[in-house]
UniProtKB/Swiss-Prot annotation:
Similarity comment: Belongs to the GHMP kinase family. GalK subfamily.
Positions contributing to substrate binding: E32, H33, T34, D35, Y223
Binding site for Mg(2+): S129, E161
TM annotation in the entry: none
Predominant localisation class: cytoplasm
GO cellular component term of the entry, any: cytosol
GO biological process: galactose metabolic process
Entry protein name: Galactokinase
Alphabetically ordered keywords of this record: ATP-binding, Carbohydrate metabolism, Cytoplasm, Galactose metabolism, Kinase, Magnesium, Metal-binding, Nucleotide-binding, Transferase
């Protein structure tokens, strides 16, 4: 890929790239919609991601091109014009990173050229947007010798998502893209940003990613609505509990104080956030003791909660996960990511991968009308520079 990208870079910009980098996508093993509720998450970086090449310019022009959106062509704007622009589509993610780096005091004193190409399926809920954000920060760090640390880039990436794009997401995606490590997941406390690397050793079992192939736009989904519902539920619980987030409430305490939330929808939203947080801790413990059956059971319970209490699945994700759960050799399956479309994951015996794909494809096509896609990817490193 890099060879063809270098040739394309020369064609587009009539110069050679000075720096190259790769930022991964991610899966979240368990812990969905807990990151903006101050809870735990359990993500891992994957070896699908976004590649980028960059060079400085002698003017103030920023020129961005994506091989994934060739029909859009080169998107150009000035270093002094960093406003959100709907016509700039994907380029708003890197534009936001430039804006917030500059506002943080980092010197980006000229324009630049950037070419990117990703192999994360677009709209698959495998975190392509965070991959682009962190990739952009990493390229600019080298290009302009910025003394910016990984954690600050992660925080700025979230700021891009929240304040520039308009999605009130948590920090999980940017964190795992920036901090991932090969063959390890991260148990992250999103309230404190304390984290632990955990080996992703599943014995004879592997994680299979199943894509609904249904597109969704996160900013236009009910993501922000769920955040508001959780905030409303938290405010009711705070009448008697001294807590800052739903993630700070254990299941027993919640059950004792659930009467404070009279509206059923708000009760269910809070119940998911709190029980899912407990499931993350239980899943971490199960993986440590190599209890893959219990880990799979927790995946199933997570999906049921996301379907019934949080209502972020939909017929496509439900068909994938619930069909996979019935396949022999599958210990558990659930949606991963924000929901509404995107992907599900299954913990499947390595000898049953073909059975999983065949059985899920048949039922999914019969019910939905088109086929899902399957990926088997290794757990990889976070953002890194690569040799040109």
């Amino acid at each position: 890929m890099l060879t063809s990208m270098k040739s394309k870079f020369d064609t587009l910009f009539n110069t050679q790239p000075e720096v190259a980098a790769f930022a991964p996508g991610r899966i979240n093993l368990i812990g969905e919609h807990t990151d903006y509720n101050g809870g735990y998450v359990f993500p891992a970086a994957i070896e699908l991601g976004t590649y980028g090449l960059a060079s400085k310019r002698n003017d103030n022009k920023i020129c961005l091109y994506s091989n994934n959106f060739e029909s859009t062509g080169t998107i150009e704007f000035s270093l002094d014009e960093l406003q959100f622009d709907t016509t700039h589509s994907w380029a708003n993610y890197p534009k936001g990173m430039v804006k917030f780096l500059k506002e943080s005091g980092y010197q980006i004193d000229s324009g630049f050229n950037i070419l990117i190409e990703g192999n994360i399926p677009n709209g698959a809920s495998l975190s392509s947007s965070a991959s682009i954000e962190i990739l952009m920060g990493w390229l600019l760090k080298a290009l302009f010798n910025l003394e910016v640390e990984r954690l600050e880039l992660i925080e700025l990436g979230r700021k891009v998502e929240n304040q520039f794009i308009g999605v009130n997401s948590g920090i999980m995606d940017q964190f795992i893209v920036g901090m991932g490590r090969k063959d390890q997941a991260i148990l992250l406390d999103t309230a404190t940003l304390e984290y632990h690397y955990v080996p992703t050793e599943f014995g004879d079992y592997v994680i299979s990613i199943m894509n609904t192939n249904k597109r969704r736009e996160l900013a236009e989904s009910k993501y922000n609505e769920r955040l508001k519902e959780c905030q409303s539920a938290l405010a009711l619980l705070q009448q008697e509990l001294d807590v800052d987030a739903l993630g700070h409430i254990d299941v027993t305490t919640f059950e004792k104080h659930a009467y404070l939330i009279e509206e059923d929808v708000l009760l269910r939203r809070a119940r998911h956030a709190i029980t899912e947080n407990a499931r993350v801790k239980e899943a971490h413990a199960a993986l440590n003791r190599k209890d893959f059956i219990e880990f799979g059971r927790l995946l199933n319970a997570s999906h049921a909660s996301l379907k019934n209490d949080y209502e972020v699945t939909g017929i496509e994700l439900d068909t994938l996960a619930e069909t996979a759960q019935q396949v022999e050799g599958v210990l558990g399956a659930r949606m991963t990511g924000a929901g509404f479309a995107g992907c599900a994951i299954a913990l499947v015996h390595k000898d049953r991968i073909k059975d999983l794909e065949e059985e899920v494809t048949k039922i999914y096509k019969d019910k939905i009308g088109y086929e899902p896609s399957f990926y088997h990817v290794d757990i990889g490193d976070g953002v890194k520079y690569i040799k040109i």
